[in-house]
């Protein structure tokens, strides 16, 4: 029965894609050539000089091991550093969650995301000013908002640490921009604008030239942090929506070795600090993942992907240049969103296995 459903879905999906006709330009496979040597990124991995990581986790969904995720995030980028978890009201994004469904012993952060981020920024700022070791601030998803605010604050702080004592790394920043694109919210709300959603109430930070080296780690097709440049491409929007659901949080548990060279871009700002983007490929298109789950063979779904991916990739401006386009799908080394730590499957098991759901 699952294969019947999968077959029907595949026929509909390919037919839907074909209905776009020539309105979606086809993109070509990536060409392994990059013009000229780019600036060198700040050292990560075993070369990292950070001795401590100030870790800020994402939105604390009821039932997930938030502290465990937060302590693991960025560990492959800074493997030799001890983790100092910066606690803040990370559950604000779920302040609307029905209390009857909260796991026993949990609490609810009844405030807006904007207030929670301000709280986290103050805590991070305090840790940075009292720290003595070279440090890296790491933000996973919502935690990246805290890093954005703190960088803007430190940019004009005469008591800020020296540039060689601190760096920032965001994983899946839902309000940020990066060398290969931008987040969903950044495409809607410019710097300084207010997000008027009741439980969010967050003001986008002004863009500043930070004195600190910065890394942005993003999953390809993650609709939160890597939204299409051309949202009229509905196929790409649908793919990004599924990508946001399954490939957003796992980005925090990847390492620099998961990123091919053409997916790393570094720029130098007016203050001499580097900003490096690491675009992590996925192992398959998120849009067709249900087909694999429903029983279609990888070979069959790969054929469908070969039809859909050029149309989806045409929605991203980074693919316009045939010589410099990055790799978005790597079946061998790409991120597997269903088996990585922080996956939606793992999160669902944690939630449904809680006593609130009879687990």
UniProtKB/Swiss-Prot annotation:
Gene Ontology molecular-function annotations: acyltransferase activity
Group of enzyme by EC: transferase
InterPro entries found in the cross-reference section: PE-PPE_C
GO biological process: lipid metabolic process
One Gene Ontology cellular component annotation held by this UniProt entry: peptidoglycan-based cell wall
Pfam family, one: PE-PPE
Keywords per UniProt: Acyltransferase, Cell inner membrane, Cell membrane, Lipid biosynthesis, Lipid metabolism, Membrane, Transferase, Transmembrane, Transmembrane helix
Phenotype upon gene inactivation: Mutant accumulates DAT in the cytoplasm and at the cell surface. Does not produce PAT.
Superkingdom assignment: Bacteria
Protein topology in the membrane: Single-pass membrane protein
Subcellular localization, as worded in the UniProt entry: Cell inner membrane
Function: Involved in the final steps of polyacyltrehalose (PAT) biosynthesis. Catalyzes the transfer of three mycolipenoyl groups onto diacyltrehalose (DAT) to form PAT.
Protein name as catalogued: Diacyltrehalose acyltransferase Chp2
Source species: Mycobacterium tuberculosis (strain ATCC 25618 / H37Rv)
